[in-house]
Amino acid sequence: MSKYFEKVSKIKYEGPKSNNPYAFKFYNPEEVIDGKTMEEHLRFSIAYWHTFTADGTDQFGKATMQRPWNHLTDPMDIAKARVEAAFEFFDKINAPFFCFHDRDIAPEGDTLRETNKNLDIIVAMIKDYLKTSKTKVLWGTANLFSNPRFVHGASTSCNADVFAYSAAQVKKALEITKELGGQNYVFWGGREGYETLLNTDMELELDNFARFLHMAVDYAKEIGFEGQFLIEPKPKEPTKHQYDFDVANVLAFLRKYDLDKYFKVNIEANHATLAAHDFQHELRYARINGVLGSIDANTGDMLLGWDTDQFPTDIRMTTLAMYEVIKMGGFDKGGLNFDAKVRRASFEPEDLFLGHIAGMDAFAKGFKVAYKLVKDGVFDKFIEERYASYKDGIGADIVSGKADFKSLEKYALEHSEIVNKSGRQEMLESILNQYLFTE
């Protein structure tokens, strides 16, 4: 019996000609492509925070979201209602996974002990729902940024008491993620950075960040948590300069501190653009370095300089993103988590469904186009030809390590005329459009 979303029935696939806004046009979860269903390929996940806890408040105005639990006043009653609403939502939109922060699902108490007690009550409730729901936990994480105690950071705080509290909070978050069957655990350092170097010991902060992550690895082993650890890069906001700036930055950090064997990255589209990178750039860099773990599927507004967390509807973007996932061989434990929120003016409960339908359709269509691009080898063939000079002759000597500066100088002196070929960017973009518009 519907209790929270009475106006919405189960969302079904009706095809691209459907005029029903509450139906999938391109996402058919049961459609089989290359031996796997679309549901298995895409591994969609619902973000608990944006979907069930966000209220539309911004720095200029109060809450706008109309939610069926808004009449409640007790924080625990609200938390319980959100769990009920969440699983009704998961069922109606046929979501395979969801993700959560610890403070999304249960309110903070006056003490850490009271907060953990609140978590235990809500986690027990979620476990009961998981017994009969198809929806599972993609990943869990700890909110180490909202409370004022994290004003100077969490594991990178100048205050050792905050470091200790953060460790206790992550310890509990790891325990409940394991208890709920989470397949990954994410670290996003929203406050792990600085505003000015005039008061910052960067070396100590980075060392402490690494110590913290090693402690997490050790505790995960101790409790038998076998999920994948993920770090989510973001260059700024809320901190001016965050230590997990982009994939390359994170990878250098992990390698320096001997953490690369334990961590992969969770890449968010809007974070990539804040770092002045294409989404595909971050995915490609992670893929070729073997650290692409999971994706936060959203998009930003290119005219705004902050994290807008909009639902992804650009087919070109989703195609190029899924191109990288397919080239990787698909997701293992990761997936596509909609770290996206409806706009402040899209305040009715039904808008939650409409936003997710738009995002799921966009990635389903993008996957199909990307699959055809990979299968046809469109870009691979061109790239192989473009770099053909490294297949034999002096190029082969360079790649094999046979060449050195002396031999290369000798070659250059004997071959003074260099002939380059066109990169054909415009042609390739036209081919991409051809696939986008016809597939």
UniProtKB/Swiss-Prot annotation:
Q: Which GO terms describe its cellular component?
A: cytoplasm
- Active site: residue positions: H101, D104
List the InterPro entries: Xyl_isomerase-like_sf, Xyl_isomerase-like_TIM-brl, Xylose_isom_bac, Xylose_isomerase
The entry's Mg(2+) 1-binding residues are E232, E268, D296, D339
Query: What Pfam families has UniProt attached to this entry?
Result: AP_endonuc_2
GO BP terms: namely:
D-xylose metabolic process
Query: What is the first-listed, main subcellular location in coarse terms?
Result: cytoplasm
Q: Which residues form the signal peptide?
A: none
The record's catalysed reaction(s) read:
alpha-D-xylose = alpha-D-xylulofuranose
According to the record, cofactor stoichiometry and binding are noted as: Binds 2 magnesium ions per subunit.
Q: Does the keyword Isomerase apply?
A: yes
Cofactor(s) this protein cannot do without: Mg(2+)
Q: Which GO terms describe its molecular function?
A: magnesium ion binding; xylose isomerase activity
Which residues of the sequence carry a binding annotation for Mg(2+) 2? E268, H271, D307, D309
Q: Where in the cell is it found?
A: Cytoplasm
Keywords for this protein? Carbohydrate metabolism, Cytoplasm, Isomerase, Magnesium, Metal-binding, Xylose metabolism
Q: Which family does it belong to?
A: Belongs to the xylose isomerase family.
NCBIfam families with a match to the protein in the record: PRK05474.1, xylose_isom_A
The name this protein goes by in its record? Xylose isomerase
**What gene, per UniProt, encodes this protein?**
xylA
